């Protein structure tokens, strides 16, 4: 997404950027999980399992520092991996914030996009588990990584709830995932659907590998994916043969949120990567209605860069939508080599 190995003089992309070919828009040594994950998910189905451990080991090497973040900043267990992270396990300093207020939580990135976004590690945990399902891989070296990543969410959100009141769980015995973040888009969320779907799917998959009572109990504390009704104007009323407003049940980005800060569509993450909804699964219509009627999903729809609308369309059985978006995504780029896309939201070439 950020140029890969094949960068060239940035003035050919943006004449204002008078730097060397080593320039990358979001920094040269920073791992941005939201972008990187889309390079690795397809490797499961293409059988390129030998290419995946380099990414898994990247996180495994950083595990101790990620755990130290939790110990030092909040005095609890679990690994806290940030979205934009250096190869030693700490946040990119520019995103962490050079001009931070002294009173601000030292564990948080002082950044409107990245604050509270800690769940992208769970996609790589799921990939690790899937390599066992697809290829019978020995994932023993990564089990501490998976367990520590899950533990963080359990301990951190119990801690935050206990600071606000007497009880660590809600009235239904569920974690209160607040404050959270649904991708970089919906901020200060309460129970983001993307985080809930991630925790539920990783826990369900991990329990099949390690049937431990601890993880079963944690699974019981994960709240349901939040739903909401959206008014759809000019819907066909078959009984009256007229066009009247209707209400469609859809996946909500979260139970609540304070602002929108980017253009991702986390309300469809329960479709992909988490596969809770899809063809052959329950409540397919809820997910399809989210795709077709959610106003932000429609506003944010695109084939550019890390956009994954074509994947969602395919998972929902929307063949023509998937075809149209995929053809647009894979059309020739603007450079001599036709598969050099970008800059899109990032840099050129954009591989994701």
Can you name each region flagged by the protein language model?
Residues 32-67, 76-85, 90, 108, ...:
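Active-site core of glycosidic bond-cleaving carbohydrate-active enzymes
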Residues 8-27, 85-114, 177-192, 254, ...:
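Acidic/His metal-coordination segments adjacent to aromatic residues that form catalytic metal sites
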Residues 1, 15-16, 51, 64-69, ...:
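Secretory-pathway/luminal and periplasmic proteins that interact with or process carbohydrate-rich
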Residues 148, 152-209:
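Acidic/histidine-rich catalytic neighborhood
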Residues 1-18, 53, 216, 235:
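Gly/Pro-rich turn-and-neighbor structural signature
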Residues 2-9, 141, 159-174, 214:
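Short, glycine/acidic-rich hinge or "gate" loops at secondary-structure transitions
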Residues 1-12, 59, 71-78:
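Short, solvent-exposed turn/loop segments enriched in Gly/Ser/Thr/Pro and often Arg
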């Amino acid at each position: 997404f950020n140029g890969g190995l094949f960068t060239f003089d940035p003035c050919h992309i943006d004449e204002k950027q008078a730097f060397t070919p080593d320039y990358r828009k979001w920094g040269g040594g920073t791992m941005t999980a939201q972008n990187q994950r889309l390079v690795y998910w397809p490797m499961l189905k293409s059988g390129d399992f030998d290419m995946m451990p380099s990414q898994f080991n990247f996180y495994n090497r950083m595990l101790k520092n990620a755990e130290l973040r939790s110990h030092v900043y909040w005095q609890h267990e679990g690994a806290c991996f940030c979205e934009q992270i250096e190869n030693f396990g700490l946040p990119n300093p520019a995103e962490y914030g050079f001009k931070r207020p002294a009173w601000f939580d030292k564990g948080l990135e002082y950044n409107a996009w990245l604050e509270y976004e800690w769940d992208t590690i769970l996609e790589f945990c799921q990939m690790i588990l899937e390599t066992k399902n697809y290829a019978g891989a020995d994932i023993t070296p990564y089990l501490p990584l998976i367990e520590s990543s899950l533990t963080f969410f359990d301990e951190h959100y119990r801690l935050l709830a206990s600071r606000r009141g007497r009880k660590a769980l809600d009235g239904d015995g569920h974690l209160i995932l607040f404050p959270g973040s649904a991708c970089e888009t919906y901020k200060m969320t309460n129970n983001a659907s993307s985080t809930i779907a991630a925790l539920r799917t990783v826990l369900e998959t991990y329990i099949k590998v390690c049937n431990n009572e601890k993880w079963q109990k944690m699974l019981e504390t994960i709240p349901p994916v939040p739903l909401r009704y959206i008014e759809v104007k000019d819907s066909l009323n078959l009984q009256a043969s007229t066009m009247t407003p209707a209400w469609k049940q859809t996946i909500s980005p979260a139970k609540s949120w304070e602002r929108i800060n980017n253009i991702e569509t986390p309300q469809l993450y329960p479709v992909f990567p988490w596969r809770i909804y899809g063809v052959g699964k329950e409540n397919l219509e809820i997910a399809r209605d989210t795709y077709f009627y959610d106003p932000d999903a429609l506003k944010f729809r695109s084939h550019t860069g890390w956009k994954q609308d074509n994947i969602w369309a395919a998972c929902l059985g929307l063949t023509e939508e998937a075809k149209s978006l995929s053809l647009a995504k894979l059309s020739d780029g603007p450079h001599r080599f036709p598969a050099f896309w970008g800059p899109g939201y990032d840099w050129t070439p954009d591989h994701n």
